[in-house]
């Protein structure tokens, strides 16, 4: 019997880094709506009273960067200087250039199927059968806590909540099976006039209890609600925010490896994003097919080259068929060339702002979460 603890964290849509991610992806969506073939690499920086949007964008579209920025911040909930940030009065600075022609010549091809990767790099995808969405439980429930925080803030249940929040959950495992939740941390920005006693009680009753399954909670479970005792100053006033600084929150909460490339603000020609989505799609279909209980996929690319330079399948001893056979199935049923995976997952649509808070994986509305290849994989593996 081997027991261990594993912890993952998430942050709300009002966290400074997530504000930046959402602005970058809102700009991307606005451009893709007009020009699906645009090349976009959009970075955002937020600090007290200001937003800077920069990067390299090559497109036939015209979008209003300032209006997109203000609308995004407004939707998150920063609409008053009392919160330290106001969508209506913050400065918006734009510093956008064009994509290098040296990169263009390596990516664009007369035959779309020969489209090269927009950069070199390695990407991972992961799936596990420990939750119904085939994601690790720690990151799944960490996301759900901060999603619930936003819900009760916006619907008026707890009107004194403010947009910035963080969650963290420690799960206890026995032989890789969940046996309970050891610790829950939730820190939320709040109005000045709420007492800590009322805050603790409301967070427990309205956020934590409705989300966490009771069978995983016991008398030993520890709760840390606003452990510093006060969280009035938050958002960009408390910390500056940057696109791409929450890559573990965005993916698997540390339970799988990460190639290092961020997602937000990048169009699908950037394999940092699109190939990570494809790797999740592959891993999820392998687990959904019952070919493994856990699966991690690695793919890698060279700039300007269409075919992946490597494909790796790791199943942690849970595979039902040999790993060598799994790799052959991946190569047969999944086109992991940049253009191929864009077509396979239908990525040239404005779907990205929704990904920029509460995780890119484990959410059914995204095409890389489909399990439409599970049946054919199972048949090809001879497990029917």
From Swiss-Prot:
It catalyses: L-methionine + ATP + H2O = S-adenosyl-L-methionine + phosphate + diphosphate. ATP binds at residues 15, 164-166, 230-231, 239, 245-246, 262, 266. Its EC number is 2.5.1.6. One of its GO terms (cellular component) is cytoplasm. It is found in: Cytoplasm. GO terms for molecular function: ATP binding; magnesium ion binding; methionine adenosyltransferase activity. K(+) binds at residue 43. Keywords: ATP-binding, Cytoplasm, Magnesium, Metal-binding, Nucleotide-binding, One-carbon metabolism, Potassium, Transferase. The keyword Zinc does not apply. InterPro entries: ADOMET_SYNTHASE_CS (IPR022631), S-AdoMet_synt_C (IPR022630), S-AdoMet_synt_central (IPR022629), S-AdoMet_synt_N (IPR022628), S-AdoMet_synthetase (IPR002133), S-AdoMet_synthetase_sfam (IPR022636). Binds 2 divalent ions per subunit. It is an enzyme of class 2 (transferase). Mg(2+) binds at residue 17. L-methionine binds at residues 56, 99, 239, 270. The keyword NAD does not apply. Coiled coil: none annotated. Pathway: Amino-acid biosynthesis; S-adenosyl-L-methionine biosynthesis; S-adenosyl-L-methionine from L-methionine: step 1/1. Its cofactor is Mg(2+); K(+). Residues 99-109 are annotated as: Flexible loop. GO terms for biological process: one-carbon metabolic process; S-adenosylmethionine biosynthetic process. Catalyzes the formation of S-adenosylmethionine (AdoMet) from methionine and ATP. The overall synthetic reaction is composed of two sequential steps, AdoMet formation and the subsequent tripolyphosphate hydrolysis which occurs prior to release of AdoMet from the enzyme. Homotetramer; dimer of dimers. Belongs to the AdoMet synthase family. This is S-adenosylmethionine synthase. It comes from Proteus mirabilis (strain HI4320).
């Amino acid at each position: 019997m081997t027991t261990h603890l594993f912890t993952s964290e998430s942050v709300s849509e009002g966290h400074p880094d997530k504000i930046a991610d959402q602005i970058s992806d809102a700009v991307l969506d606005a451009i893709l709506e007009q020009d699906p073939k645009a090349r976009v690499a959009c970075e955002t920086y937020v600090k007290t009273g200001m937003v800077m949007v920069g990067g390299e964008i090559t497109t036939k579209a015209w979008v209003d960067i300032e209006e997109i920025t203000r609308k995004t911040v407004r939707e998150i909930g920063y609409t008053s200087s009392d919160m330290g940030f106001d969508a209506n009065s913050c400065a918006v600075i734009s510093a956008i250039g064009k994509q290098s022609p040296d990169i263009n010549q390596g990516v664009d091809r007369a035959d779309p199927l020969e489209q090269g990767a927009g950069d070199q790099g390695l990407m991972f995808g992961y799936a596990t059968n420990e939750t119904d969405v085939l994601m690790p439980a720690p990151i799944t429930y960490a996301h759900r806590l901060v999603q619930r925080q936003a819900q009760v803030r916006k619907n008026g249940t707890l009107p004194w909540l403010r947009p910035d929040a963080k969650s963290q959950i420690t799960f206890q495992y026995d032989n890789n099976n969940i046996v309970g939740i050891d610790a829950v941390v939730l820190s939320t920005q709040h109005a000045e006039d709420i007492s800590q006693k009322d805050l603790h009680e409301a967070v427990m009753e309205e956020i934590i209890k409705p989300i966490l399954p009771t069978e995983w909670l016991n008398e030993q479970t520890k709760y840390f609600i606003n452990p510093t005792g006060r969280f009035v100053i938050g958002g960009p006033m408390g910390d500056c925010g940057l696109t791409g600084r929450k890559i573990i929150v965005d993916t698997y909460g540390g339970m799988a490896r990460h190639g290092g490339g961020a997602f937000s603000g990048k169009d699908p020609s950037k394999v940092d994003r699109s190939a990570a989505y494809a790797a999740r799609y592959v891993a999820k279909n392998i687990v959904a097919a019952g070919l493994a209980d856990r699966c991690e996929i690695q793919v890698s690319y060279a700039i300007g080259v269409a075919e992946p330079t490597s494909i790796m399948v790791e199943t942690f001893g849970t595979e039902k068929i040999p790993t060598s056979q799994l790799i052959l199935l991946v190569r047969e049923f999944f086109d992991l060339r940049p253009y191929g995976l864009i077509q396979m997952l239908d990525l040239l649509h404005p779907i990205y702002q929704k990904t920029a808070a509460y995780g890119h994986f484990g959410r059914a509305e995204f095409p890389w979460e489909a399990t439409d290849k599970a049946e054919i994989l199972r048949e090809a593996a001879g497990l029917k």
